[in-house]
């Protein structure tokens, strides 16, 4: 269930209090693997049974309406997941695993044919990716990957299936090989701020930074962009990110969820269940802990106790210049009304009445002022709930945005310096310090 708070400055709540027993929002989609054992184990130990898969699907229905898998063949999971997902009310995004061997593609293709023949492949299938990070792993070239995808797409079209088909890979592959963008039906990118060594407070912001250019490309090409893998680990140690904790996983999800919801972003959380078999298979400890659920299908407590509230989008207009406070590439500027979707995002902010933060939609960073003097710098910085430089209060009677920590100072613009955004001593009836908070739809 989603909770909405239609107030002017609605709070986004991140509470780990133990007062709830389930995640109160639904994810767009979740990645799933029916594996439970390492590569070398016999199928009885390596693969979940039909009843175990069905149990998983019922658990996932509580947090999403879509599930995404990576292979038709591995653990025979397509044949098990498709009926189990339908029973649970879940749509399925299928995956075909690719390697440097075209013979393996033919095996997956043969399984695809049998799924169509049996009727398991029906309108409940909403997407199909051919390959997952195969180019990134340097097993095949981009052109080979496109060839594989075209082969599968041509086949399903010949069978009367219009399912959109794509290639899933890390975002840099899409940047390095633009021909992939033209070839796919929609863009499917994997992006993990976690592996890039950023502080969790900037995890969602880093994700936005990394995908911004491909979002622009997708809009220009009139194609959807799906974030096919995104997530954060709750345990283990990574040299770049440090110690992973349940609290940090919950923090990243909460921040990212708000970002995705505000932009109607399609994404698949990585991953559904913790998977100790990945460590047995030779992976790092952190790789076992990306799940929402434990391996026994119980929801992890950091998700179970997480309550996410609704944040209303707002625009901030200066009365003196009649321009809008805007953020681009971590910098502030004042802009006029625009029909460009990217500029509209830059002009949109979220007020958090609990933390007193003002967070940008386009960058997921907070309005920050660290120089308490006239002309002091105001910028955006990674949001930290207890950071005094990020505390603001809006005085509706005067239209002033007052700094809650640096008493006597207000958000100000200087027309003589190109409407520079700055901190300045609060003064009465100053149009450069008068701000109107409005719904972006009313700009």
Question: How would you label these PLM feature ranges?
Answer:
Residues 28-31, 35, 40-45, 238-246, ...:
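Aromatic-rich peripheral "rim/lid" segments of glycoside hydrolase catalytic domains that contact
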Residues 310-443:
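Lectin-like carbohydrate-binding module/patch detector with strong preference for beta-trefoil
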Residues 156-175, 222-230, 266-277:
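Aromatic-lined carbohydrate-recognition surfaces of secreted/lumenal glycan-active proteins
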Residues 1-22:
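Fungal secretory targeting signals
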Residues 27-111, 115:
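N-terminal carbohydrate-binding/catalytic regions of secreted carbohydrate-active enzymes
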Residues 79-163:
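Substrate-binding cleft of extracellular glycoside hydrolase catalytic domains
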Residues 88, 94, 126, 132, ...:
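Aromatic- and acid-rich polysaccharide-binding/catalytic face
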Residues 192-196, 221-249, 273-275:
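Active-site clefts of carbohydrate-active enzymes
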